[in-house]
């Protein structure tokens, strides 16, 4: 996701894309990429750029976005993390419970067991989770293996 040694990215993008990447929990605009980037560092909207700054003039507003990578550099390549966020957002209007039972074939009981430590109701949607709650889910389960628990570590 980020080239080795890169600490800061400065990108210009359509305003709506910047909103989705920087949206906070409980926002319907939240996306898997935005959550991943927020776990990796800080995102800051530097400034808006009006359509008049370009030739030909586009029909969209732009935003300059600064991304400072401070932690979890390889998060975007982690297959378990990618499976977790993609599977959780598989069908936007569905709850986490319904996405997990449909996408991974977990039983309703198994899906409820994964939600319980977060203290969330079973009606929770993926955009409602905090970054800490996403981290907890990622640490507890190997999501690329149909949401199963992480394998026990054997003797070294």
Give residue ranges: language-model regions:
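Class I S-adenosyl-L-methionine
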Residues: 1-126, 136-156
């Amino acid at each position: 996701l980020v080239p080795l040694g890169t600490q800061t990215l400065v990108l210009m993008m359509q305003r709506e894309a910047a909103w989705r990447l920087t949206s906070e929990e409980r926002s319907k605009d939240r996306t898997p990429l935005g959550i991943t980037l927020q776990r990796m560092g800080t995102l800051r909207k530097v400034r808006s750029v009006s359509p008049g700054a370009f030739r030909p003039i586009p029909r969209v507003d732009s935003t300059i976005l600064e991304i400072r990578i401070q932690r979890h550099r390889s998060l975007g390549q982690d297959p378990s993390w990618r499976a977790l966020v993609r599977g959780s957002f598989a069908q936007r209007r569905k709850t986490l419970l319904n996405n997990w039972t449909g996408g991974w074939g977990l039983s309703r009981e198994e899906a409820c067991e994964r939600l319980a430590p977060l203290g969330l109701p079973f009606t929770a949607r993926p955009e409602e989770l905090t970054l800490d709650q996403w981290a907890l889910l990622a640490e507890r389960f190997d999501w690329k293996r149909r949401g199963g628990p992480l394998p026990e570590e054997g003797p070294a």
